[in-house]
Design a protein with these regions (language model features):
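Non-catalytic, usually N-terminal nucleic-acid engagement modules in DNA/RNA processing proteins
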Residues: 16-33, 37-187, 204
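C-terminal accessory extensions appended to soluble enzyme cores
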Residues: 1-96, 298-299, 303-392
């Protein structure tokens, strides 16, 4: 796709998770998938839902449907050609390394009720808050202008996180100007930017998922080519999706960071655990040091930190609770919240900073406990090797 190419917008409505649509280990691939021409990219559906193939999810109204990318639509070939097909073409050029960042980074949702500048070493702000939704380029002409707008300290490092609701993510694709967008973001000098998390809905045709993956890779290439330090969002619905990202990472040896978002997976603990296991398998199969930038997934932080070289937690809770006038407190290892009333017109800076301190401490305790466990295991293994050598 060229810079001048027209990008077709999508209208995505909120959907709710259906466990019968989740891939199940040991479940046979649907019969209708075996003859599908897209099987080599998709891998087929292995789900409990009584479907012949993914086309059973088609709404049957191709003339009016604008929700997903479906072969029944007239615009289907246009949407697929925008990303050059379903292949994930390896990126073999240099990728700017991720700068030193703390393992806990709070997300600043907006500047409302903040006085600033916030005394924080690093913060994350939404990519879609700094992009003009009409032109596709940054709203701010300089880093200083952006920091002032979000009440951020001049010395703070900034992550641009591209996780958001579907409508904002899809609109970004609609206004994206690959070269101009990336160059305008480079002027803001972010310490890291994540690629958009184009959705992988479980209740739609797989073609929509395949295009989402290609869009993620397309955005990564544009950001990386502009010299931005970027984390690839490996959004996936099936084991085959994770396998394709693994192959892409192996074939793109310069990529040093990936991103993932657990908050939109749903409240199913087994499903969250499945995604965490897939991430662990991915980094082990890639066999090189990777940084993981993750949103949500607190309960799997220790497991992930044992597999990745570094884990950076992006947290929206501290600011969200401060906006609701709630203060963080610890009861044992459990994080709880209590009311924290403020006077009319009073800023929430101190409340936010307090919440950040408590959440940061909780995050680091999880990470340090896992590191201590890893060191103990390594010491035991070394002792066994030494003992075995001495006996021999």
């Amino acid at each position: 796709m060229t810079q001048q190419a027209q990008i077709t917008p999508l209208t995505v409505r909120r959907k709710f998770a259906d466990p019968t649509l989740w891939h199940q280990t040991g479940q046979e691939v649907r019969l209708g998938c075996t003859t599908c021409p897209e099987l080599r990219w998709c891998g087929g559906l292995s789900i409990q839902a009584p479907v012949f193939n993914c086309m059973d999810f088609c709404c049957g109204k191709p003339e009016t449907c604008t929700r997903y990318i479906c072969p029944s639509q007239r615009r289907y070939s246009t949407l697929v050609n925008e990303v050059g097909g379903f292949d994930l073409h390896p990126y073999r050029h240099r990728v700017t390394p991720v700068l030193a960042l703390p393992d806990y980074v709070p997300c600043i949702l907006d500047a409302g009720d903040l006085g600033g500048p916030l005394s924080l070493p690093a913060v994350a702000v939404s990519l879609y808050s700094v992009i003009d939704h009409r032109t596709g380029v940054a709203k701010y002409s300089s880093r200083q202008e952006m920091l002032k707008r979000f009440k951020i300290h001049p010395d703070a490092r900034v992550i641009l996180t591209a996780t958001a609701k579907d409508r904002r993510v899809e609109n970004f694709w609609h206004v994206l100007q690959p070269k101009k967008t990336a160059e305008s973001l480079r002027k803001l000098r972010p310490s890291l930017i994540t690629t958009p998390n184009f959705s992988m809905h479980a209740d739609t045709v797989r073609h929509d998922n395949l295009v989402s993956m290609a869009r993620i890779a397309f955005c990564f290439e544009g950001f990386a080519a502009a010299g931005l330090p970027v984390a690839l969002h490996v959004n996936s619905r099936t084991p085959n999706d994770f396998a394709r990202w693994t192959e892409y990472l192996i074939a793109s040896p310069e990529i040093n960071a990936i991103a993932y978002e657990m908050g939109t997976i749903g409240r199913s603990a087994p499903r969250r655990a499945w995604h965490a296991q897939q991430l662990v398998a991915l980094t082990r199969n890639v066999r090189r040091h990777l940084t993981l930038v993750i949103r949500a997934g607190w309960s799997h932080l220790a497991e992930l930190s044992s597999a990745f070289e570094r884990v950076i937690m992006l947290d929206t809770t501290a600011h969200m609770k401060a906006k609701k006038r709630q203060s963080a407190t610890r009861i044992g290892r459990r994080l709880t919240w209590k009311p924290a009333h403020t006077a009319a017109g009073e800023t929430i800076d101190e409340l936010l900073l307090h919440n950040v301190r408590v959440c940061r401490r909780a995050t680091r305790e999880l990470l340090s406990a896992q590191r201590a466990s890893d060191l103990t295991i390594a010491a035991h293994k070394q002792h066994e090797v030494t003992t075995s050598t001495a006996v021999n």
